[in-house]
UniProtKB/Swiss-Prot annotation:
One MF annotation (Gene Ontology) recorded for this entry: toxin activity
Pfam families given in the database record: Toxin_cobra-type (PF21947)
Superkingdom as given in the UniProt entry: Eukaryota
Origin organism lineage: Eukaryota, Metazoa, Chordata, Craniata, Vertebrata
The species this protein was found in: Thrasops jacksonii
SUPFAM superfamilies attached to this UniProt entry: Snake toxin-like
Gene3D superfamilies linked: CD59
Keyword terms of this UniProt record: Disulfide bond, Secreted, Signal, Toxin
Gene Ontology annotations for the cellular component aspect, listed alphabetically: extracellular region
Signal peptide: 1-19
Keyword Flavoprotein assigned: no
Organs and tissues of expression: Expressed by the venom gland.
Protein name as it appears in the record: Toxin 3FTx-Thr5
Similarity comment: family membership: Belongs to the three-finger toxin family. Ancestral subfamily.
Subcellular location: Secreted
Amino acid sequence: MKTLLLALVMVGFVYLVSGQNRTCHSCTGTVCFKLEECKEGQNLCFEWKIIGDLFGMKTVRGCAKTCATPGENEKITYCSTDNCNI
């Protein structure tokens, strides 16, 4: 009986968690306070930077569906937990 109850609780938890969208920081610039709820299917947060930008002014953060290949002098970091791209 306890096993059945535990199984039902686990199924309910997985169902509830799977329906939530990812939340990522979304902004341009060094300091980022704005949070964005990502669209369905966008399960990654990213931080895109220009290499050699000393002050971090060319930094973009947001949500992504897939990983892109960085161009020359670019660095893109991806993560898959809420608010991980700070």
